[in-house]
Every structure is written in structure tokens, then in C-alpha cells.
């Protein structure tokens, strides 16, 4: 039995997410998804400082004050059902309604650098599309991942939704990742991490959405306000001690 999405094995976590996804698409509509997301934001916003302190305590990375800002963005600004478009095509033959269907169960890998923000943001976006997700968290952030998964699931249940919209094995390893990647129920893989992680996910032969190495350049040319550019680069590159892969790493 799971404990708000936490299971002893990856196979149990996958099975629970698969069962939840079937119930999700059968019994709940777009308005329900909006309600679940609103409840996640409502219940987790007051816990942002708690989450930030937990991340720093467990991983030893970054700065608490910056994690507060990062987790706030993940909880309050991650896109929901408004990002799921629908359309109607009219012709002499009638009307055709176009809408996006869910993948089903998604397998996701999360990093030690952004353990709580990644899980919450991923789950909001994925459930907006009618999916459920099985996370394989970084082993150095198990407490963070557990808090995020349980917090999200509790909010959804409190809003009248199904259990196990997001799940994870209690003790994630490379072996549990294999169990998730190659599970027939898992139709899409999502990864946040480095090039090795991307290569591993690609080996499953499934659709993959993954972020590889982050080395973004900044171009500062003759039209730039140098003082403003320097201040912006400094603020970005020092945010959370430069943990974010999107922060400036080199300059042209």
C-alpha cells in the first residue's frame, strides 16, 4: 500500500499511477483539473519556506532565500489547463473539434538541485493534460521528493480527486529508474538533469522530453548598457548559488 504516493517499489508506484490515470480521465474533466491545481497552489503556498529550508538542509546546495523565490514560482506560476488548447474547424461537412489527449503515465527523473520545485511544476503541468506521473528522485533528495509528492497528492485528494496522481518509489536508485523506464504503462519520459541522464532515458526507446547540459551564453554587444548588463548577469548567475542551468555561464 502507498502512503500518499510513496511506494516500496517502483513497480507498485507505476501500477498505482496507471490505475489513477484510468480513473482520472474517466471520471474527471478539465474543470476538475483546474480545481486540483488551484488546491495544490492553495495548500502548498504556505509551506514554501518550509520546503526551502528542507531543500537546503537535505542537499546542502544553494541559498534558502533564493529557494523561496524558486519554489514560489513553481507552485504559483507553473502553467495549468490554460496551456491545453482546443479548437474547432468548420466546413461544409460539419464541425471538427480538436483537443489534446493525455499520454497516460509519465516517468520523470528529478535533480538534487531543484528537487521540490521540479516535482511540483512537473505534476501541475502533467495533470493539466490528464496524465499521472511516476518520479524517480535523486537519491540525495529523498526527503524533499517525499514531501513534495505527498503534499501534492494530499491537496488533490482534499479537492475530491483521485489518489496517486503522482507517485515515487521510497528508495529511488538506478534499478528503480529502469523499472519505470521500461514499464509498458509508461508512455513518455521526462528528465531534468545532465547529459548522462538524457542518454539513459533515450535508451528506453520511448518519447523523451529532457534537459541536457546547461551552458547558456549571454551576448553583450556595443548597444548594451554595461552597468545594467553586469547587474543582471550578477543577479542571475548568483541566484541560488548558480544552481540553475538557465543562468549565464559564458559571455560573448
Explain the meaning of each model-derived region.
Residues 1-97:
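N-terminal Rossmann-like NAD(P)+-binding subdomain of aldehyde/semialdehyde dehydrogenases
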Residues 4-5, 198-252:
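ALDH superfamily catalytic-core signature
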Residues 27-41, 173-189, 196, 200, ...:
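Aldehyde/semialdehyde dehydrogenase
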Residues 84-155, 159, 204-208, 215-216, ...:
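Conserved small-residue-rich beta-alpha loop and adjacent elements
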Residues 135, 168-170, 190-193, 208-212:
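General beta-strand structural signal in soluble alpha/beta enzymes
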Amino acid at each position: 500500500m502507498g502512503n500518499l504516493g510513496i511506494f516500496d517499489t517502483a513497480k507498485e508506484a507505476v501500477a498505482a499511477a496507471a490505475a489513477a490515470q484510468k480513473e482520472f480521465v474517466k471520471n474527471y474533466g478539465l474543470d476538475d483539473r483546474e480545481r486540483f491545481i488551484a488546491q495544490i497552489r492553495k495548500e502548498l503556498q504556505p509551506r514554501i519556506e518550509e520546503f526551502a529550508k528542507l531543500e537546503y538542509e537535505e542537499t546542502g546546495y544553494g541559498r534558502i532565500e533564493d529557494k523561496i523565490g524558486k519554489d514560489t514560482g513553481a507552485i504559483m506560476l507553473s502553467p495549468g489547463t490554460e496551456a491545453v488548447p482546443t479548437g474547432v474547424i468548420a466546413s461544409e461537412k460539419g464541425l471538427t473539434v480538436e483537443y489534446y489527449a493525455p499520454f497516460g503515465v509519465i516517468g520523470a527523473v528529478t535533480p538534487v538541485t531543484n528537487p521540490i520545485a521540479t516535482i511540483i511544476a512537473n505534476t501541475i503541468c502533467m495533470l493539466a493534460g490528464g496524465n499521472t506521473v511516476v518520479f524517480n528522485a535523486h537519491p540525495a533528495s529523498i526527503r524533499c521528493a517525499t514531501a513534495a509528492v505527498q503534499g501534492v497528492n494530499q491537496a488533490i485528494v482534499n479537492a475530491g480527486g483521485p489518489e496517486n496522481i503522482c507517485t515515487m518509489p521510497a528508495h529511488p536508485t538506478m534499478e528503480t529508474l529502469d523499472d519505470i523506464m521500461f514499464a509498458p504503462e509508461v508512455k513518455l519520459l521526462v528528465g531534468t538533469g545532465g547529459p548522462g541522464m538524457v542518454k539513459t532515458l533515450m535508451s528506453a526507446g520511448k518519447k523523451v522530453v529532457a534537459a541536457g547540459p546547461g551552458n547558456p551564453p549571454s551576448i553583450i554587444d556595443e548597444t548594451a548598457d554595461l552597468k545594467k548588463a553586469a547587474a543582471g548577469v550578477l543577479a542571475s548567475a548568483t541566484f541560488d548559488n548558480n544552481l540553475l542551468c538557465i543562468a549565464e555561464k559564458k559571455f560573448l
